[in-house]
């Protein structure tokens, strides 16, 4: 439907004002950001085209300015507004470790890291550094790319922990496929890191795999009881 043919009360801006943002669809919220259309097409049409072209809302945060401007009706100015809005959305869900977040279970880790890691297109190996009370003091990305047991060196993992005077760590990585089943390499990496941690006096509390809205804890699955 063209925006010009809508009753004023049905326009996205009016509906947001009177009914709240939750009453709007993804395309209507995008239309507000896009603001104006192009010849023969409304901002709502352009918003729908954007969603269809890039396979839905969750992919939009990965788009570059150049990607956004491939949609007719989205020039540099509009692309900058959209990119800024996507980044603000990400930052709103990013946890500030000054909040003194205490880890008591794998689900606590998932609550902190899921929004950051579930949509990453490359594998990331991340370490949460904890103090003696299991409060997160820092998050550090150790590696980006294709992970296997040979590229994750304990030296790099524990160097970060020693530098931060961390008493314990939790390691995480994501599976871009969304499947959180631990691979052989995941298990080998877990065992090696746990054994190195025991020698250094820095406890490895868990290895968590992040997928598409789900996670696997290698502690919960029993892999921390294994030895070579």
Curated annotation (Swiss-Prot):
Alphabetical list of PANTHER family matching this protein: DNA REPAIR PROTEIN RADC (PTHR30471), UPF0758 PROTEIN YEES-RELATED (PTHR30471:SF3)
NCBIfam families: PRK00024.1, radc
GO biological process, one term: proteolysis
Keywords in alphabetical order: Hydrolase, Metal-binding, Metalloprotease, Protease, Zinc
Organism: Staphylococcus haemolyticus (strain JCSC1435)
Lineage: Bacteria, Bacillati, Bacillota, Bacilli, Bacillales
Residues annotated for Zn(2+) binding in this entry: 173, 175, 186
Protein name stated in the entry: UPF0758 protein SH1266
One Pfam family matching this protein: UPF0758_N
